[in-house]
Amino acid sequence: MTHTNEHDHKAEQQQNGRGDTTTETVNPQKMKLVTKLLIDNKFGLMDDLNFSIPLTASSEGVPISAKTSELGTEYLKNQQENSVSPILPISRSTRIKADRVRIYLDYYYNILERCISIDSSQNHHEGVEGVYNPLQVIRNRKLKKKHHELPTREFYTTKHPIIAIKQFSKKPNKKMPWFVDINEKYMDLTWRTSHWEELVDPQGKLWFQSYSPSNESSGSSSSRRHHGHHIHPRRHLQHHSRVRTANSVHSNTQSLTPKRVMTNEEDNNNHNNNNMITKIATTPEAQISRNKKSDLNLSHIHLEVPITNTVTNTSSDQGSLIIEAKGSSYGGDRRGSSNTSGSGGKRNSKHYRSKSAGPPENEKSRMNGLEKIISKTSKGWSRSPKKNTPGLEKQVLLNPTISNGGTSRRSSNNGESISTNSSKSSMGITFGNTETYKTPVDNGKDAIIRQSLLSEVPVHTLRGKTSNRSLRAEGEQALESDKELPNGAGSIYEGAPREKTTSQGSEPVGLVSDSLQVDEQLQRYWHDTRYIMSTVAMMQHRRETHDIVKRREIARRNEIEITQDADTNIRKTADALTQYDNELNKVLKLGNDWTSKLLNDYSIRVETLISSSDRILSDINTTLTLKLKMFQENTERYVTVKVMRAQKMTKTIYRLLEFGIVLVLWTIWFLFSVLRSIRFTIFLVLKIIKALLW
């Protein structure tokens, strides 16, 4: 007994567990909702097909069908309460019209909502913005008519719905109707943004006397204002273009204007009898005038030396450079040197003059005329970057100074000797004691042909204390190497001349050649070597300064200013990170739970729901197909009944015709039989009379 009871108890627990699982997996409310949706779809389909179930009314007013009459009225009442209310039969055209009106009203209320729902911060026009006022639209309509601003043409792809105020008014086509349409409302919103100063209030006064801050660029009322509104932007554009042009001219002026030449105090003290060296500031007009000269006259290169050298580069057909150095020397000694070249045997002379002496008169007058012409068109040249580029390339001021080392042979200046490089990085301005530097290739002409071997190396000026120091060190090394040469041979460093020609009076003196012989090939090799060494030193110094600046910038960026307690910040950060990790673990756990539920529980529920919905849909499809077949059978039966009724009618007619014919024949037979009987009776009476008479 106990064993059987335990077995029954286990079976009940299993059944309860199954029931719990079924209740957990299936939600009756969702099933009801799905069933209602399917039934609604069914009735909608039946309504579209104009198919209805024939029902018979009971005594209590409850419709009873033939199949469900056996269940009773109570069941039918409950079913009627829980069932969906029947849909009224509405035609398709009525639904289309109702949908059109609904879309119209939704659009209208959407526009009204956009007009009214404006934040107070954006509402700059109180009384007009953020207010639904169709009377204001009608007043704006009058203003449009006053200024002949006709409304835009309206296009309708479909018929607009019937508006009652237009449809049932006495005059539907008024010029000024008291009705605001959607299109008019929308156009009024656009129109009033440029006519705020013309809007009129109900008293006939202007709403806004002047422009509001948000509408400075809006239009105005009259045609004059409209015209000005279209013209002012061009004036502003012209003004801005002039400002930009001025800025570009100013920037070009700054770019074209080189730095001033730095003079030497020792040079001023030592050269008391000579003219003072003035500071040169090249203007853009003079720069452009020098750039616009003929191809034979290139720009001058100003050298920062106590004896200022003006180098004039004259390009020949073969591309050679004829170099003249002009300046003033110190003291009354006048010494010139000249030497003949190896092949040509001609003399290359160098003339020195002071910079304060200025150019010749004819050249000065030509420069003034060109400057007057160029000053008129300087704006057009300043705007073009291509026209300003050659000027920047042709004139470069170099200011690295090199210490002299105390030798009197260098120059009269005891302080520094300046090295010069051209903007093209080497134009070959190297001078010997007796002649200008020439390349190993010589064609025997008077001009010195300089190949582009050294011009391939780019050399840029380094301005600064560090560059000056490095160049001074290079200069000292050059002086030490110069001391080893004979007294007659002059030392050259990067093309800096060191000859003395004229005195204060600039009197011409015959050139005196040195008594000592100089190896020209060795001197050229030495010049090339010193030039390349100086170039490499300058480039190395530039790389070192660039590395120093880069390291400083990286160190400045990597500096972190800690203004608070670092330990407290670290502790707070650690606490925040731990809290974040805990919250993240909670969220991950919750997400894992949900994923497991979705994969395990809800997947089963979804499968059961899908299977039940498929079953219900299949039942609905079968019922619909059966009903459709019944409908088809009924229609066919109706056709056959009509045919059968037609056959019965003809049969009755034929029978009536037959009966009539038989009746006529029987009447004829009856008549003949009556006549025959009458005849027989007459003959019988005659015979009886005859017999009696006899």
Swiss-Prot record:
Keywords: Cytoplasm, Membrane, Phosphoprotein, Transmembrane, Transmembrane helix. Residues 1-12, 471-485 have a biased composition (Basic and acidic residues). Residues 211-222, 403-417 have a biased composition (Low complexity). Residues 1-26, 211-287, 325-437, 465-511 are annotated as: Disordered. InterPro entries: MTC4. Its main location: membrane. It is a single-pass membrane protein. Residues 13-26, 244-257, 276-287, 418-437 have a biased composition (Polar residues). The modification Phosphoserine is found at residues 85, 481, 491. The modification Phosphothreonine is found at residue 263. The chain crosses the membrane at residues 655-675. Residues 223-243 have a biased composition (Basic residues). It is found in: Membrane; Cytoplasm. It comes from the Eukaryota. Disruption phenotype: Shows a slower growth rate on YPD and minimal medium at 15 degrees Celsius. Synthetically sick with temperature-sensitive CDC13-1 mutant. One of its GO terms (cellular component) is cytoplasm. The modification Phosphotyrosine is found at residue 493. Present with 396 molecules/cell in log phase SD medium. This is Maintenance of telomere capping protein 4. It comes from Saccharomyces cerevisiae (strain ATCC 204508 / S288c). The gene is MTC4.
